[in-house]
């Protein structure tokens, strides 16, 4: 007798941030696809407005809508609520009380943006072609600087804690290797990745 897969997903975005459907549509699809558990994890508010993160004035609606849907579909699927929270710097990260005090089931910690040498916030969560342009424009083509900045932020995020899941840990891995084919064979990068995933494991994620 074949073993049936236990379908779950805890990283999803709806119309409260940059998702392409409303919360209930995602839940209905998860049920129709046979999921046993599903998590909603919109992008958390940042200290400034963006096109892809939730605003604080939407938080109450976000939590209330989830609560209503959790009750509505309680006999069909386990639903849990979270946020994907960015580490931006030592003043903006998942461990802040403003995020810890929210009634969430879980939190995802992620890095989507870096500071350029001039202090400009640069979104590096982009398609590979756009990533190349951003590295050239804001970092003078210094891919090594971008890589070290990204992973240093992740190490700081791990030390601060305040989350349950590390978000898309391969984000830089893909874009950087497209920018510089052969990167994955460079010893320093291989050692950096090994240290990163070892640190994740040591922190219990």
Where are these regions (language model features)?
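An N-terminally biased module of ancient metal coordination in phosphate/nucleic-acid-related enzymes
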Residues: 2-89, 94, 99-101, 105, ...
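Domain-core and long-helix interface of multi-subunit machines
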Residues: 16-17, 103, 108-205
């Amino acid at each position: 007798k074949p073993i049936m897969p236990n379908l779950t997903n805890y990283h999803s975005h709806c119309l409260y941030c940059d998702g392409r459907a409303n919360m209930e549509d995602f839940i209905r699809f998860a049920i129709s696809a046979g999921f046993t558990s599903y998590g909603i994890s919109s992008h958390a508010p940042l200290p400034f407005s963006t096109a892809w993160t939730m605003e604080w004035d939407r938080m109450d609606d976000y939590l209330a809508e989830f609560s209503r849907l959790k009750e509505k579909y309680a006999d069909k699927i386990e639903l849990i609520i979270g946020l994907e929270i960015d580490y931006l710097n030592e003043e903006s990260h998942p461990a802040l009380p403003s995020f810890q005090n929210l009634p969430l089931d879980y939190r995802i910690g992620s890095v989507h943006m870096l500071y350029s040498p001039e202090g400009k916030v640069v979104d590096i969560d982009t398609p590979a072609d756009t990533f190349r342009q951003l590295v050239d424009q804001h970092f003078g083509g210094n891919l090594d600087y971008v890589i070290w900045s990204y992973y240093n932020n992740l190490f700081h995020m791990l030390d601060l804690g305040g989350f349950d899941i590390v978000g898309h840990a391969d984000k830089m891995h893909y874009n950087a290797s497209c920018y510089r084919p052969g990167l994955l064979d460079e010893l320093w990068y291989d050692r950096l990745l090994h240290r990163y995933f070892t640190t994740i494991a040591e922190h219990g994620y």
